[in-house]
Amino acid sequence: MAEKLNPNATLLAIDKSEKRQKFTLENFQKRNLSYEVKTALPEDIKGSFDLVLADVPCSNTGVCCKRPDSILRFSAKDLASITKIQKQILEEAARLTNSNGQLIYSTCSIEPEENILMVEEFVKNHKDFSLIKYEQLLPTLEHDGAFAALLIKK
């Protein structure tokens, strides 16, 4: 995605995990991308953006072929906890999205509560957003499962 952006674009990586921040920066360096990458917490950010990607923490049920233990460790209590966090992140991502901007919501989950149900509830409660399209990939031996939805802010 970053490779398709305007070369003068500023990328802003928001993640509490220093390990994931480092991983993101390493990926940009591997691809010889010359973007300025900043890390911050959502509450520290002023302004809004044309494109926001919310790749949220999830149950990891989409990686069950690679890590079968992800299914064994998963519980209804975990689902309730993780969906609460996902809603908070989606709310922050919405706040950071410009009018006429795009918001991409993604997980590596196959759980409807984390995916299409989350997005449908969000759009129902945020009349200024429209669901343009979504895709749910189920896990196979060739690839992990994943979900992504494209929302537009009116």
Language model: regions and residue ranges:
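S-adenosylmethionine
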Residues: 1-154
